[in-house]
Amino acid sequence: MMDRRGFLKNATLVSAACLMDFREALALGAKDAEVGKAWKGWKKGQFQIHLIYTGVSESMFLIFPDGTTMLLDCGDHNAIGRGKLAVPVLPNPDRHAGEWISRYVLRVNPQKDYVDYMMLTHYHSDHGGNNKFYARKETRDGKDYYLSGFSQAAEYLTFGKAFDRCWPDYNDPLPLTQEAADAFEHMKDFYDYMLAHKKMEIEKFRLGETNQIAMRKDAAAYPGFSVRNICANGRIADKEGNIRDLYAERKKSNPVKFSENGMSLGVIFTY
């Protein structure tokens, strides 16, 4: 067993190695001739990942080699209300994150306002929005409906299908009533509305699969591209399909909640 001194020494070495890798990556990026130039758009055969930074939301927009598109996370939360920990809304606070994200997608999406897939990695407001911090509140289907995160983006974008970690019963591995109640109620209302009025499909994320998140336009042209579902709800799947539950021991004590971060969805893209 490693003692404290040995642990600290190894941790320092690992940190230094990571820092060197990061510096090397920055140096390589700075040498790239395309850095600083205007984006030239997407071309068939390219796999593009756009990291959308608004300061208050996690979000990525992906364009697969055949043009299939996916919005991964689209949140919003009251970052300014955190006082000294506040983060500025980018590019400016004139709009909420859901609108900023959708405006960006409209500019780079080869399908204009249509997005094939959307996926919420886990139920935290900075990933999906919530009912306490929103751009606008409306009455839809006889109840309050809040435009925040994904629900705000859906006012500008059309989503074909959603992948969710625990839809439709929201109880895998535990009911979503404790750790993520606000984000859960918000996303449930959003899903219900999209099913009823926008014909969006919803599927539970299937751990270990390699064909659930698939190219929809010309998959045969790119046999080397794949998306493998590797983690969900505290479980991980290896490439042989074996699944390991990282929370198996903790479940024996009958907990009422787990951290949503540990429940996150994860995929591996191969191209």
Each model region followed by its residue ranges:
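N-terminal export signals
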Residues: 6-29
